[in-house]
Amino acid sequence: MKKLPKLVQATRMLVCAEDLGMVPDCVPWVMDELKILSLELQSMPKDPSVKFGHLSRNPYRSVCTISSHDMPTLRMWWDENIQRTQEYYNTMLYRQGPAPHPLPGWLASDIISRHLTSHPCSAY
């Protein structure tokens, strides 16, 4: 840990790590030590025992987002896997019946609003 602390201390900006997928065991410790924010995606939970992350369970020091630079947009994700979308619609959005396709604007707005208003999440 020679260069990273200097980079983090060189700015007043909040630093966020893309700690998704397979990350080395030392990463959480380093992030905690340097107060680096974690990146949280509801559709890609870090807990392998769940299909979707619960926004209310995101760490205090985190940024939650709908997707990242190498993932599909919300509308693309919605139509990618109808069965997964249906499960999200029922279990995460608590809605009954078939999930609408394509994703209507009112529902996209609801999903984004849930991310923006979730605590302690800071959505960007």
Question: Which residues does each predicted region cover?
Answer:
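Catalytic cores of glycan-processing enzymes that make or break glycosidic bonds
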Residues: 1-124
